[in-house]
């Protein structure tokens, strides 16, 4: 009954036009970063909702659900800022690069001088892939809350959530094809495959599920899984933005490396926040990783000091006392600090990768956003 009332209320707000998108929140010193792409970010959610229109209200309601309580929009922000930062790498006529192929009158008439309509569309596609992954993840993880509201699987059930996620990926694929850039299409298509591969790696949890000893391969396995589930989309969408802007292979590689490092650091800090934040701050359940039986970075670092964690990891913390015991072991070591240090190393690599770009407000914003990954609270 509560879910029905909530959805009815949100539909009323939608019809009255009172649902507003929120954009990535920057600290006071970094507000110029959001100002640089404010106009473009305001078009992300409306553009996505337009692409998700269908003749089925039943389908639209679920597929557009996560565009109502808007998230951080980190991924489209990165794509847009990267597009802006790399637009200074050469002097091509950006008013005629690839935009004639986008079948959207609103986008064709949109011009900033630095961000191409095709790059704006890429930012929307990137967020669509992310939203689809959230719909699927919440079913797999039996989530109850997302962005401070009932998760889609709770509001609509598992079947509708999975089908809505599939629908979003299909519409995103159509938008990719309309970019008429085979290299970009291939990059983003591999992201979708990476998301699935990452979920399968997570099912196994460690490289050798029977081993009770911590090995370097456990950390390597964790990083590979983190790339596939989180960093791949960020890395490849950043790289794709430079391809649409006809940048050099060197610049494209740098953009991809920045995205890879940002994405990996983001996942590391996500694992930290699972221990250090509360549900109402995160907008989702804290402590969920141990309940799902996942061996995240803090657990791996604690395992080095407390070998008994090996058996818990192998058994996916299925004993009634395992979760509380594992949490206590993590908290009485410097595992959290080690994870943060590891994330900071990736942030440094991310910033270093962009030193080949001309100094600009957009590049400074990318640096600021990188720092924000470490200091964020949710």
From Swiss-Prot:
Q: Tell me what organism the protein belongs to.
A: Schizosaccharomyces pombe (strain 972 / ATCC 24843)
- Return the EC number: 2.5.1.91
User: Could you name the domain of life of the organism this protein comes from?
Assistant: Eukaryota
Protein's gene: dps1
Which key words are in the record?
Isoprene biosynthesis, Magnesium, Metal-binding, Mitochondrion, Transferase, Ubiquinone biosynthesis
This chain's protein is named: Decaprenyl-diphosphate synthase subunit 1
UniProt-recorded Gene Ontology molecular function terms = all-trans-decaprenyl-diphosphate synthase activity; metal ion binding; prenyltransferase activity
Binding residue positions for isopentenyl diphosphate = 72, 75, 130, 147
Pathway of action: Cofactor biosynthesis; ubiquinone biosynthesis
According to the record's subunit comment, the protein's assembly and interactions are: Heterotetramer of 2 dps1 and 2 dlp1 subunits.
Top-level EC class: transferase
Which reaction(s) are listed as its catalytic activity? Answer: 7 isopentenyl diphosphate + (2E,6E)-farnesyl diphosphate = all-trans-decaprenyl diphosphate + 7 diphosphate
Matching entries from PANTHER family are given as: ALL TRANS-POLYPRENYL-DIPHOSPHATE SYNTHASE PDSS1, GERANYLGERANYL PYROPHOSPHATE SYNTHASE
Q: Name one GO cellular component term.
A: mitochondrion
Leader sequence segment:
none
Q: Which PROSITE patterns match?
A: POLYPRENYL_SYNTHASE_1, POLYPRENYL_SYNTHASE_2
């Amino acid at each position: 009954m509560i879910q029905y009332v909530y959805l009815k209320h949100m539909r009323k707000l939608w019809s009255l036009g009172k649902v507003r998108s929120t954009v990535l929140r920057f600290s006071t010193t970094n507000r110029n970063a959001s100002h640089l792409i404010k106009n473009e970010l305001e078009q992300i959610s409306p553009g996505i909702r337009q692409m998700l229109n269908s003749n089925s209200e039943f389908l639209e309601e679920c597929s557009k659900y996560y565009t109502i309580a808007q998230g951080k929009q980190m991924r489209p922000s990165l794509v847009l800022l990267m597009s802006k930062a790399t637009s200074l790498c050469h002097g091509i006529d950006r008013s005629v690069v690839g935009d004639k192929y986008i079948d959207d009158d609103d986008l064709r008439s949109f011009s900033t001088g630095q961000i191409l309509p095709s790059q704006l569309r890429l930012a929307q596609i990137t967020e669509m892939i992310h939203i689809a992954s959230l719909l699927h993840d919440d079913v797999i993880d039996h989530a109850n809350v997302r962005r401070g509201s009932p998760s889609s699987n709770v509001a609509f059930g598992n079947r509708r959530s999975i089908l809505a996620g599939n629908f979003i990926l299909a519409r995103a694929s159509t938008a990719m094809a309309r970019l008429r850039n085979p290299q970009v299409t291939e990059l983003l298509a591999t992201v979708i495959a990476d998301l699935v591969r990452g979920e399968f790696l997570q099912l196994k949890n460690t490289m050798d599920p029977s081993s009770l000893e911590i090995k370097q391969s456990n950390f390597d396995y964790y990083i590979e899984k983190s790339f596939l589930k989180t960093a791949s989309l960020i890395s490849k969408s950043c790289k794709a933005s430079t391809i649409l802007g006809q940048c050099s292979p060197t610049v494209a590689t740098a953009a991809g490396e920045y995205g890879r490092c940002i994405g990996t650091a983001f996942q590391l800090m996500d694992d930290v926040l699972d221990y250090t934040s509360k549900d109402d701050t995160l907008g989702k359940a804290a402590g969920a990783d141990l309940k799902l039986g996942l061996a995240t970075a803090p657990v791996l670092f604690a395992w080095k000091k407390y070998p008994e964690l090996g058996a818990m990891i192998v058994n996916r913390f299925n004993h009634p006392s395992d979760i509380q015991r594992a949490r206590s072991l993590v908290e009485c070591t410097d595992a959290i600090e080690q994870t943060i240090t590891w994330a900071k190393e990736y942030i440094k690599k991310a910033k270093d990768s962009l030193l080949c770009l001309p100094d600009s407000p957009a590049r400074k914003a990318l640096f600021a956003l990188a720092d924000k990954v470490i200091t964020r609270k949710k």
